[in-house]
């Protein structure tokens, strides 16, 4: 059972208990540290059984519990309610109810413990290098950990009288007949440190009014009307989950950007935050501004092999845990990606097109120019004019620095893995798109027509060369990548779908690309696989080698739409949105790439993040795609092509440079 607020989250069992171990990664986490590894409730020394759980909201849950009666029948004379809310730390309202005709004496105990494990250590049970300490007074229990200047503390308190010890707190109760007892428990987290690249001080516990905040968030978003109830559920779930995944980096001045996903990626990720902001632009454009400003703040300035940092490079990942603080991991911050930098320029341009906010474009001109310069000055590792990647941090850096960042995601048709550097095809599309959009910004806002002309010339040349060098004539498809020798990595993969939304594909080749994407080797009926069936490494439950990723499909569908393949885009949208209904409206990070005719439902991927930011954003981009929404100067153009399963669809109060508008569409595809 999970509840979350930004990068603070709680994972517990069905009773609400936390018992962390290398095989049980439960706990209270904040800023990449587990602040609570034990939180176990007993009554008279016995654990409780679960009657039901209320998933009240993303930040709140309630557990209804009873003692073990020793029979299959629940005939308890006592029950317990735990109502929990998260926000920095967490708060738990604990209520014990006596249903008997006589008073009862009870010993209620909360065992509490903190291992202060780094998020990267929770599965390892590694021995900590610092020292644990505790302090007890009449009103609280403080548990702490310190390693040099790295300091984390958890403070536990109760509104009702209790006895604290270093392992928890105990209540000795006498509850009258048909009466109840309650207390409010607070678990507050704090962090104090000073490390090489970042300074963090103060408490992490914000205790905001999350319910009021969510209400305001939902009130600002467009209202959807349609005749498909499951789509209503998916739309609302997407907006709520996007609210849940918001967090405020300490550099963002209290404004929010999307964290990547629960549980392992509740942090700022350049690529994920950019793509999620792109997906959500027609619905919550304010996410994009915060994302752009935060990433601009952490843009690379020097050559640093440990962090894979270059001047102009956009950050990949920012962590606050112990391993980052002592550079056992390079994530404070880490720059090892090859796509976030061009995508930064893409988002900046798309943000202005939707909002008309030229102020941000002008303020971020130096960062955008630095990002564009990075493409030519640092990303062309092979000297052939293409963006490629090879980690300089051989010990802890990422090998694959494209979005498919697992070890086996880039392979030849026969399963061999290419040497580094690797130039994956979609990176070239992003670079092309960034240059074209950068040219528009330079000409319109930066008043530099010569620079705009140069970027346009570079983009045109890149498109010409790409359509020659990456094309596989025998397969009528684009290669997955070029290897270290400049030879084509000839596997068929979903990466070529991203070429469509970037616009780098010659129109004469687009039909062949779409034919592959919608063919039986890639399209399952639920969505497009990451790797085509028949390729040597294909596995329908392989992370990047056969599973279906909703975010991937949303951008592919958008690209199809941009090339005029509106019906095909609607089919992809229909498959993904059908799948969402089987996940109660919450699309996971990925699901199995099995043919739809084999299964009555999409097969779950066992370790998928959920909620996950760009999966949460996928239905939003698919709605934009189906309705054909495009900003055109000071108005929005609409060209709906909906799956026939959707009779009618309306979005009301879409925000943008035009104010707010309503759009409508009917299903015909």
Each predicted region: which residue ranges?
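Alpha-helical support elements that line or immediately flank enzyme active sites
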Residues: 272-303, 495-507, 553-569, 573-576
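Catalytic cores of secreted or luminal carbohydrate-active enzymes
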Residues: 608-646
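Extended glycan-interaction surfaces of carbohydrate-active proteins
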Residues: 64-67, 225-268, 293-335, 381-423, ...
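An extended acidic
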Residues: 1-77, 84-89, 99-103, 114-121, ...
